[in-house]
Amino acid sequence: QRQANAVLGGTSIGRPYTSGTFSINGDDTIVATIGSDKKPADLARVQPDESPLFLTDLNNDLLGSKTLASTQRVTWPSSHDGKLIEGWVMRPPEFDPASTYPLILEIHGGPHTAYGPNFSTEAQLYAAAGYVVLYANPRGSTSYGEAFANSIDLAYPGYDYDDLMAGVDALLEEGYINKEQLFVTGGSGGGVLTAWIVGKTDRFKAAAVAKPVINWASFVLTADLNYYFATTWFDTAPWEDIQSYWDRSPLSLVGNVSTPTLLLTGELDYRTPISETEQYYQALKHRGVDT
């Protein structure tokens, strides 16, 4: 069958990452993984000026009887410099614009990756539970050109915080978000930004920080790609300029945190070692923050 409003991707079914693969034969016919915000990828044949012709239908037996949420593309200017930021809003399936809803800000990892209008098990579950979900591509994300991706060079985390907070503010202006019920979460690079956010503002009722970097100095000496991080994300080694590492570490802001914070990391995570999470957990406990 043919399907409009489909996008390349859909191979990352947990969160709405832009992922996918394709193959081209000699007559310029493309076979690709094509999905949508309501369905993970199927194989489809793609030809110019035609909707994709799907060759598989892998999940209809499961999802065909479900009421799923749709996404809406939104944009807003960053509060830092007016740079246009793209995001998507997912509302509960039975959304009523006259009601108010809690909001979850969900932040992608990387940071050099991107979200899109793709299927997301997590976002669908949040929406089914009655939450509005906002996810976005702040500066540093891929898909918007090299300059946009590299705008966080030696400055991460930083103004990406302003990009995301401006998105929350823009959604609040729509009138259907309960400003007392704001939540934030993210994993890896999203965990970095979630921990950074609760150190900068107390506007969120609770946070879930997954597999974060909390202390850049300890991270570059324990992570699996330690040499890469120390030589490309910073100008010098931590013992040569410890202040540059500290200034960008969420741990430097832990004295400001009052938001109840859940921490999640795998014990065998070599990219964002469990020792990062343990530092943050102990620091929050020392301060009496619910964690």
Enumerate the predicted regions with their spans.
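Cap/lid segment of the alpha/beta-hydrolase catalytic domain
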Residues: 50, 58-180, 187, 214, ...
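Multi-bladed beta-propeller domains
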Residues: 1-20, 46-78
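Short glycine/acidic-enriched loop and turn motifs that connect beta-strands
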Residues: 36-39
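Residue position within the beta-strands of beta-propeller blades
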Residues: 30-33
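A short loop-to-beta-strand structural motif that recurs across blades of beta-propeller domains
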Residues: 42-44
